Structures are given as C-alpha cells and as structure tokens.
C-alpha cells in the first residue's frame, strides 16, 4: 500500500530498457516486481534452489510507479513476469488489458486462500489476480505520550496538541481517504469539489504532520520521531515488537481496507515460472515465514495453523472480522486519479 511517486518518463524509460536485455526472458529467469520488504530474500533463494529459476527481483514504492513502468515495458515488448498491484490497480489494469488470466489449475496450493477474500468486485472469480497480503490502515499511538483510550477517530489527528507529532502515509489515496471519510464523502469519489474540500481539510492538518512515510512507517514511531498517526496493521505489529508502548487503534469511522495481489502481465515471458512462484508462496510453511518475518496478514489457511497462538490471535496481524467489514476498500477512480495527484502535489509542497 503505498504512495504517489513521480518519475520522469525519460528516466523510467532509460532504467527499463537498461534492465531488460533481449536475452533476459529465458525460462530460467523470472522477473518479479514487488513492494519493498514483501518477500524475505532467503525464500527467494530457496525458490531458485528448488526450481533452477533465477529470480530477478525489483521493488517499487507505489502503484503509480509500478503502473508507469509496466506501461513502458508494454511498448518495448519486454517486461516483468509477476507483479503485485493493489486491488484498485488490478481493476484498472484489467480494463486496460495489461494482465493475463492466471491458470488456477497450476496452483496446487490455491485452496489455502480463505474463500471470503476471493471473488471481490475488482476481479470477480479472480480470473486475473489472487490475494497475496491484505490489511487495514489505522492509527498508531505512543502510549508513553498519549493515552490510547482518548484516540477513537481519524479526527483526533487534527488535535492542536499533536503539532509536529503526526505521521501520515505517503500515499495520496490513503491520505485523502481519511479526509473524505470525515467529510462524509466516498473515499472513492471522482468529484473534484469533494476532493478539493478534502484537500482544504488536510491543509489544516499540516502543522501537525512531522513526516509522510510509506517506506518503513513503523521506524519513526519506534525511534520516537512521531507519537501518533497512520500506519498499516502489519507495520504496527512490527513496531510493537520493538516498542511495547506503541498501540494500534481501529478508528470508529472505519480503517482503510487494502489488498495487494499476485498478477501476471500480458507481456510476461516466463508465465510458467510466475505460476510456480505463486504456488511456492502459497505453501503454508512459506506463508508462515512471510507473516512472521514481514509482519503482513497473508491469507493462508494452512499457515495460520502453524503460527503460535499469540501470533495467530494478534488483532493487529489478523484484523477482527468486524473491522474488516467496516473497512472501505479503495476503488479505481479512472481519470480522477489526476485530480487526486494535483491536490496531493499541492499538499506536499505547502
């Protein structure tokens, strides 16, 4: 989950063409494009040892960065074999014919995915994607500075006593999601007036904001640089392992529900390898490693039975069903993404 990340197309083109040579797509190589810190490196090495497939692993920091690079690789006839877009980008990429169907018959471990996380509106029947990790964005509080019992709403971030103490994720849709929710508007609105009003609300928050961070949002909390703000539930889990004073709060208006997914681009050369890598990560013993090491809620029935009771029952790592139900998932806003980006740019330069 993550952020708007502006790149010049020139730089993207140069980096992309440099990355992919004509011989790069032999079946013994698999080009994976994923979020930072989403798969432990030793698991990647284990996959290569088992299959003989060399994984060329690259990372991105936002859906926008991933999408822009895939657009360029479509035009050059090269590209990645496996990508991990968020739900609203899956829908966008399906519409633009950027993804090919996943052959579920090749996935012996697909039954490990809980059924209630399948068949979502952004990809009915999961023809083009499967859930990798999911979670909720809520509020982190340092109990040494702030009583967590006094924090119940997203609106609490605007309290004047929190000047210079707030962290917001560096993700336009997430940040505007909060303001739109407080304004009583849909977080997926395409109405510019609604987005502008949300921007004006966020302007008033800026004196409180110490940083925008979507790289490792748990770090500023652990290091005491901020005392309250946005955080993903998995990052909150990792943060509390470092500092027991950090508490995670689900806001009464609802947290932000997100899901990042396996998807195979239409330009993929090693489609067989992509399926093998998906199935490898769906193994319960491997999913367990991802959950424990990375701190993300990986939907895997078998993995949950392998976890200690303390981890399996942690409400940060595995959000309660009522909070998931209350959470609102981001949807594709079409061309209105440019409106969000415009006001996001204004907000970040204030």
From Swiss-Prot:
- InterPro entries, from UniProt? SBP (IPR006059), Sperm_putr-bd (IPR001188)
- Main location class: periplasm
Q: Where in the cell is it found?
A: Periplasm
Which GO molecular function annotation, any one, does this entry have? Answer: polyamine binding
Q: Quick one: signal sequence residues?
A: 1-26
Instruction: List the keywords (alphabetical).
Output: Periplasm, Signal, Transport
One Gene Ontology cellular component term attached to this UniProt record is:
periplasmic space
Set out the biological process GO terms recorded for this chain's protein: polyamine transport
The text of the family note is:
Belongs to the bacterial solute-binding protein PotD/PotF family.
Which function does this protein serve? Required for the activity of the bacterial periplasmic transport system of putrescine and spermidine. Polyamine binding protein.
Protein name per UniProt? Spermidine/putrescine-binding periplasmic protein 2
Say which species the protein is native to: Haemophilus influenzae (strain ATCC 51907 / DSM 11121 / KW20 / Rd)
């Amino acid at each position: 989950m993550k952020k708007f990340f502006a790149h010049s197309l020139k730089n993207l083109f140069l980096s992309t063409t440099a990355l992919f040579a004509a011989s790069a797509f032999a079946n013994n190589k698999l080009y994976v494009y994923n979020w930072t810190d989403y798969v432990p490196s030793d698991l990647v090495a284990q996959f290569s040892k088992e299959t003989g497939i060399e994984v060329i692993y690259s990372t991105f920091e936002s859906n926008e960065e991933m999408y822009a690079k895939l657009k360029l690789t479509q035009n050059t006839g090269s590209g990645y074999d496996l990508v991990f877009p968020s739900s609203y980008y899956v829908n966008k990429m399906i519409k633009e014919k950027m993804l090919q169907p996943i052959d579920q018959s090749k996935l012996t471990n697909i039954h490990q995915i809980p059924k209630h996380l399948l068949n979502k509106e952004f990809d009915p029947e999961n023809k083009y994607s499967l859930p990798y990790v999911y979670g909720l964005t809520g509020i982190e509080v340092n109990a040494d500075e702030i009583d967590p019992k006094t924090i119940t709403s997203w609106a609490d971030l605007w309290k004047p006593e929190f000047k210079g103490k707030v962290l917001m994720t560096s993700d336009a849709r997430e940040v505007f999601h909060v303001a739109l929710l407080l304004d009583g508007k849909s977080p997926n609105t395409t109405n510019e007036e609604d987005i502008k009003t949300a921007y004006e609300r966020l302007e008033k928050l800026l004196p409180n904001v110490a940083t925008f961070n979507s790289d490792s949002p748990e770090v500023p909390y652990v290091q005491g640089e901020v005392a309250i703000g946005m955080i993903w539930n998995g990052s909150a889990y990792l943060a509390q392992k470092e500092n027991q004073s950090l508490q995670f709060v689900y806001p009464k208006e609802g947290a932000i529900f997100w899901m990042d997914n396996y998807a195979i681009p239409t330009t993929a050369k090693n489609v067989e390898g992509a399926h093998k890598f998906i199935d490898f990560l769906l193994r319960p013993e491997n999913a367990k490693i991802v959950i424990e090491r990375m701190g993300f809620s990986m939907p895997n029935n078998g993995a949950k039975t392998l976890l200690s009771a303390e981890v399996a029952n942690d409400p940060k790592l595995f959000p309660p069903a009522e909070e998931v139900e209350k959470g609102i998932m981001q949807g594709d806003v079409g061309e209105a993404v440019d409106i969000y980006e415009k006001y996001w740019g204004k907000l970040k330069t204030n």
